[in-house]
């Protein structure tokens, strides 16, 4: 595994280039501001007078329509949601994607699964911070950065590495370290992590633990503290020190109980389910399902969101977060 740092990368490859960041959500804002503050020439491409138009202007950006930005830019960095990218690409970006330009992403979904097929003569790269946008910006402003990934799918100009690594440096990623990988590896591992562990697995584990305690007669408030609130403390220890030192920092009771009981929670069946989830990602079944969901205007997803918001743990959690000063009334 090759890791690149600031000293390994020069920004010179981008000094005479214009980078169009398409989208101004969490990542779009953070990445565009960081590159701008690194001295790079950045424009932001958005829907005319859309919700983010004024936000980007107020942040000091030159804001253009997506078509105008794509025409002007040497590098087009697409940071709108996965499900919108192909349609926007075909109608507003592709006509201006001339030979020698670079098409860039922060997630490989649409390239890996073939929803976007760039023309010949165009570099296709990926630069992905391994952190939410707010932390990408916060750590940059503090003089550091978050780790990131770079990938090269097509090197049409023989300068794709210089381009994508300089983008990573401009965003601040090489301050912490940038790993080179592939579109396939980034896409499939990212989807798996979200579904099986980080978003899907963890929330289901928390919910099951909370419900077990409440159903046994314990107060919802105590159940929330013990199964959800304190999770951050443990995750922070793992994040900073790894498993071994996390076990060292908790009590002997917690260490013994956790080590002797954990395999009864995440069982061989759980791992078999993870392998099936990974297969669905690898063979495209998940992608087809998600595309159909998007075509149905996210009806199932919206229903799941509503049900999730009605869970008892959400009501109790909101009350306790306000008590702790972590959440404010909207």
From Swiss-Prot:
One GO biological process term: L-valine biosynthetic process
Cofactor binding remark: Binds 2 magnesium ions per subunit.
Catalytic activity: (2R)-2,3-dihydroxy-3-methylbutanoate + NADP(+) = (2S)-2-acetolactate + NADPH + H(+); (2R,3R)-2,3-dihydroxy-3-methylpentanoate + NADP(+) = (S)-2-ethyl-2-hydroxy-3-oxobutanoate + NADPH + H(+)
Residues the record lists as binding substrate: 251
Pathway(s) served: Amino-acid biosynthesis; L-isoleucine biosynthesis; L-isoleucine from 2-oxobutanoate: step 2/4; Amino-acid biosynthesis; L-valine biosynthesis; L-valine from pyruvate: step 2/4
Pfam families: KARI_C, KARI_N
Statement: the UniProt record of this protein carries the keyword Amino-acid biosynthesis: yes
One annotated GO molecular function: magnesium ion binding
Catalytic-site annotation from UniProt: 107
Chain residues that bind Mg(2+) 2: 190, 226, 230
Location of the KARI C-terminal knotted domain: 182-327
Known cofactor(s): Mg(2+)
Keywords: Amino-acid biosynthesis, Branched-chain amino acid biosynthesis, Magnesium, Metal-binding, NADP, Oxidoreductase
Enzyme Commission number(s) of this protein: 1.1.1.86
Binding, NADP(+): 24-27, 47, 52, 82-85, 133
SUPFAM superfamilies noted in UniProt: 6-phosphogluconate dehydrogenase C-terminal domain-like (SSF48179), NAD(P)-binding Rossmann-fold domains (SSF51735)
Residues bound to Mg(2+) 1: 190, 194
Annotated InterPro entries: 6-PGluconate_DH-like_C_sf, KARI, KARI_C, KARI_N, KARI_prok, NAD(P)-bd_dom_sf
Residue spans crossing the bilayer: none
Function: Involved in the biosynthesis of branched-chain amino acids (BCAA). Catalyzes an alkyl-migration followed by a ketol-acid reduction of (S)-2-acetolactate (S2AL) to yield (R)-2,3-dihydroxy-isovalerate. In the isomerase reaction, S2AL is rearranged via a Mg-dependent methyl migration to produce 3-hydroxy-3-methyl-2-ketobutyrate (HMKB). In the reductase reaction, this 2-ketoacid undergoes a metal-dependent reduction by NADPH to yield (R)-2,3-dihydroxy-isovalerate.
PANTHER family referenced in this protein's UniProt entry, alphabetically: KETOL-ACID REDUCTOISOMERASE, MITOCHONDRIAL
Similarity field: Belongs to the ketol-acid reductoisomerase family.
Protein name per the record: Ketol-acid reductoisomerase (NADP(+))
Species per Swiss-Prot/TrEMBL record: Methanococcus vannielii (strain ATCC 35089 / DSM 1224 / JCM 13029 / OCM 148 / SB)
Gene for this chain: ilvC
